[in-house]
């Protein structure tokens, strides 16, 4: 009987075993969700629109819980760069540099000064063109981050041998809005959210198999969905909704009218009504 218990314990623990990485992963492109595939496979527009993005602020006021850090924010502060990337990847917009506008203006001043005193390099002898103005601005912010929206788990233990799993869901929410540069009118606005999954699996054994002989062992692992990827997915989804809403409102149009029945556009059109909480 003791041997049988040992065998069961070993099998139980080995079944939950996840081998730790032997070395750090090599640099690679950032993984992307289904929202990125949808964004990059949208039907073509009649013409691309010049758009400017200044600053997507974090309005959550959330910080990482102790003991991780009391000074690091709970959500990434790179939402502006993510939105610019999403707008460009959609092939519907031409983003104009606005986040680093001061750096761009300084560089142009250096070129003009060199042109005036005759010391300009060969690659900058052509007079600078005026900066392109945007037709619309995309404003927005990270409007919410809620931790432990839902949690749960399941487990079992028999004669000191058992296993359990637990999970937790957090949620991040983003607001995006399209603003007419000429009038300041808000043409379209959307709120999107994405859940963040964290889970833990562990197993262990704690049992006396003989007098003064104790068998004890445990193993487990945790997996946390990166907040950065969830924020990127929420922004990409928001851009798709803005494009779809703009088509319906006549703000912009498709190159091919028949593409209104495109599978991706139809899917997001059906999702335009928020689900009940």
Swiss-Prot record:
Keywords associated with the record: Cell membrane, Lipoprotein, Membrane, Palmitate, Signal
Residues where lipid is bound covalently (S-diacylglycerol cysteine): 16
Record has Membrane as a keyword: yes
Sorted alphabetically, which PROSITE patterns does this protein's record hold?
A: PROKAR_LIPOPROTEIN
The way this protein sits in the membrane is described as: Lipid-anchor
Q: Where is the lipid attached (N-palmitoyl cysteine)?
A: 16
Which GO CC terms are listed, alphabetically?
A: outer membrane-bounded periplasmic space; plasma membrane
Identify the Gene3D superfamilies for this entry.
Answer: ABC-type transport auxiliary lipoprotein component (3.40.50.10610)
Q: Does the record carry Nucleus as a key word?
A: no
Domain of life of the source:
Bacteria
Where is the protein localized? Cell membrane
Q: Where is the signal peptide?
A: 1-15
Listed InterPro entries:
Curli_assmbl/transp-comp_CsgG (IPR005534)
Q: Which family does it belong to?
A: Belongs to the CsgG family.
Q: Which NCBIfam families match?
A: PRK15184.1
Per the entry, what this protein does is:
May be involved in the biogenesis of curli organelles.
What name has this protein been given in UniProt?
Curli production assembly/transport component CsgG
State the species of origin: Salmonella typhimurium (strain LT2 / SGSC1412 / ATCC 700720)
Provide the taxonomic classification. Bacteria, Pseudomonadati, Pseudomonadota, Gammaproteobacteria, Enterobacterales
């Amino acid at each position: 009987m003791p041997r049988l218990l040992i065998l069961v314990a070993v099998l139980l623990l080995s079944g939950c075993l996840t081998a730790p990485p032997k070395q750090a992963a090599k640099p690679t492109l950032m993984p992307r969700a289904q929202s990125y595939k949808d964004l990059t496979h949208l039907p073509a527009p009649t013409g691309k629109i010049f758009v400017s993005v200044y600053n997507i602020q974090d309005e959550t006021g959330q910080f990482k819980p102790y003991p991780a850090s009391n000074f690091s924010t709970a959500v990434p502060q790179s939402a502006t760069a993510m939105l610019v990337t999403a707008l460009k990847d959609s092939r519907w917009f031409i983003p104009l540099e606005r986040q680093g506008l001061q750096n761009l203006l300084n560089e142009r001043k250096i070129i003009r000064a060199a042109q005036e005193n005759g010391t300009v390099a060969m690659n900058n002898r052509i007079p600078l063109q005026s900066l392109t103005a945007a037709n619309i601005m995309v404003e927005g912010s990270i409007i919410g981050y809620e931790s432990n929206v839902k949690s749960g788990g399941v487990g079992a233990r028999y004669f000191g041998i058992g296993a359990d799993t637990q999970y937790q869901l957090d949620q991040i929410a983003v607001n995006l809005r399209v603003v007419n540069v000429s009038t300041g009118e808000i043409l379209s606005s959307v709120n999107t959210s994405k859940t963040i999954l964290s889970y833990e699996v562990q197993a262990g054994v704690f049992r006396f198999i003989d007098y003064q002989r104790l068998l004890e062992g445990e193993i487990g692992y945790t997996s946390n969905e990166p907040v950065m990827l969830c924020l990127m997915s929420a922004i990409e989804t928001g851009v798709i909704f803005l494009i779809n809403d703009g088509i319906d409102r006549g703000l912009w149009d498709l190159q091919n009218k028949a593409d209104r029945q495109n599978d991706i556009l139809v899917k997001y059109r059906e999702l335009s009504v928020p689900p009940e909480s």
